[in-house]
Design a protein with these regions (language model features):
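N-terminal beta1-alpha1-beta2 module of alpha/beta enzyme domains
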Residues: 1-84, 209-210, 224-226, 341, ...
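Acidic (Asp/Glu)-rich catalytic clusters
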Residues: 2, 43-47, 78-86, 112-116, ...
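N-terminal small/glycine-rich loop or linker at the start of catalytic domains
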Residues: 2-30, 129-134, 183, 188-215, ...
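Hydrophobic faces of well-ordered beta-strands that scaffold small-molecule active sites
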Residues: 6-12, 53-55, 88-94, 117-124, ...
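Flexible, glycine-rich active-site loops centered on histidine and acidic residues
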Residues: 11-31, 100-183, 236
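Conserved, mostly hydrophobic/aromatic
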Residues: 45, 49, 81, 111, ...
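Glycine-rich, proline-tolerant flexible connector loops at the mouths of alpha/beta enzymes
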Residues: 52-72, 231-236, 308-321
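C-terminal helical cap(s) of enzyme catalytic domains, especially alpha/beta-barrels
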Residues: 133-144, 152-159, 237-244, 313-337
Length: 366
């Protein structure tokens, strides 16, 4: 299908999408969380031409048994990656089921400042009841209750990002004033499990509002910039994208590619001996690089981008960099991000006006 060029995102948490991916990694297990490892994966993805990197997270181990994966917090890793990259966007997963929106807004606004406007946020949720005890909070039980927490949390975070107008920081030596207090605004929100009073403690992010990504099944589409849509086939993805109601849509695609040493099927079978690759209802390509390029070509016009979940980063990322992305760029099926641009610009999203400044301008115009 023809359509605008795709934007490409890559999930880089752990050693890959498969829970036993570490068994085929080229590094020793104790190097997974090393600064060199984190920086090298990010650099390889940026050099390949990905527009966005995402980093999964959670307060509990993702599984039990011998294939439990350790991780450093996604926001901390994202901040580290921001300092060692210059073009690619970075979006950590931050669940809102139990986290305080005030602290989430501060962390993510800080990330946007550190990255000079390249930050995003993948909204997620904590589904396991054990997570509540980590936060010292009552269990949020049921999908509807978790959705309310996410929806209310996103609303508050967005309002906090706007609680500082763009020119609130004046740094006037002549008047000894650092802030224009009239351009700071009081947020007054009362939810079921928390309240937020007052402005943020971090100035408005460079992008105004970070790019917010998430599943429209969990967060209302009008609160998202990018819907992450799933489906086991092209028809299902098309239906999900059409129903998302968001400015942009990205298809979720799990990937296992043929390599010089083994076919994709052999690689998957090797890992399946240790743990199953869970079915998350996503498109899944197991096969050649050419086949993946063809699939992504079919997604043009259906979605605005794709987020790839490689089976094993150390094996699949080199194949993506060498055999998949170059022909996509050559045919203009996908585009590289441009130096000096924000993540919103890369995704074709306008920088939003500050809600308080816009309201004041409307009042003055009357």
């Amino acid at each position: 299908m023809s359509g605008p060029a795709l934007r490409l995102a890559l999930e880089i948490d752990g050693d890959g999408a498969h829970p036993a991916a570490w068994r085929r990694a080229v590094h020793s297990p104790d190097q997974l969380l090393s600064p060199r490892r984190v920086a090298s994966v990010a650099a390889a993805a940026e050099n390949a031409g990905f527009t966005l990197l995402t980093l999964d997270d959670g307060v509990l181990p993702p599984g039990v048994g011998p294939d439990v994966v350790g991780r450093i917090g996604a926001v901390e890793r994202a901040a580290f990656i921001a300092a060692s990259t210059s073009v690619v966007g970075i979006a950590p997963v931050v669940p809102l089921t139990y986290a305080e929106p005030f602290h989430v807004s501060s962390q993510l606004a800080s990330l946007d400042h550190i990255s000079v406007g390249r930050a995003g946020w993948v909204v997620s949720e904590e589904t396991r009841p054990e997570s509540a005890s980590v936060w010292g909070r009552p269990v949020v039980d049921g999908a509807a209750a978790r959705a309310r927490e996410s929806s209310g949390g996103v609303e508050v975070v967005r309002e906090l990002w706007d609680s500082w107008e763009d020119d609130a920081v004046i740094r006037s030596v002549a008047t000894s004033r650092y802030l224009d207090r009239d351009r700071l605004h009081y947020v007054d929100f009362t939810g079921d499990t928390y309240t937020v009073k007052g402005p943020a403690i971090v100035p408005r992010p460079p992008q105004g509002q970070l790019v917010v990504l998430g599943s429209p099944d969990r967060v209302p589409g009008d609160q998202l910039d990018v819907a992450l849509v799933a489906g086991r086939d092209l028809a299902a993805v098309t239906a999900s994208a059409s129903a998302a109601g968001t400015p942009r849509t990205f298809a979720e695609v799990e990937v296992a590619l043929d390599t010089a040493d083994a076919t994709a099927e052999e690689r998957v079978a090797d890992l399946e001996r240790h743990a199953p690759w869970s079915d998350r209802g996503r498109l899944r390509h197991i096969g050649s690089a050419a086949g993946l390029a063809a699939l992504l070509g079919e997604l043009r016009g259906v979605v605005d981008g794709v987020r790839l979940h490689p089976l094993v980063l150390d094996e699949d990322l080199p194949e993506l960099s060498r055999l998949v992305l170059p022909p996509l760029f050559e045919r203009r099926y996908a585009v590289r991000p441009l130096p000096g641009a924000s993540l919103r610009t890369h995704l074709g999203l306008d920088r939003p006006a500050n809600r308080y400044a816009a309201a004041a301008a409307q009042e003055d115009a009357r």
